[in-house]
């Protein structure tokens, strides 16, 4: 283990969480990291509560910019790496894949939703991601749910 890049943020293939989060806005990067490491280090419910706090703060502040990509980086770079990172999630943690992809999408995707309406990342987080994480916390014996 390297203290700068601990094992709970790495995959078997060597990808690291920061390979995705470097392209994300602050709150969303923190939420992604806490969901990713949940159950890999310390108390899973506590990590999920921290992720929920970052997501709720992101939803509450629409004036804060979403992911800002440096020149030369395509919007698909982070999600593409994110997809590769999620392929390495162990079977027992597959529940994380959907909320992690929703966090990436909410922070970086602009355009239309599948129904043809404008995509709204904050609605996705509020209506799908937060309830899913709170349900998981409740299943772990936490208070949320």
Segments predicted by a language model, with ranges:
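Intrinsically disordered, low-complexity regulatory regions
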Residues: 1-145
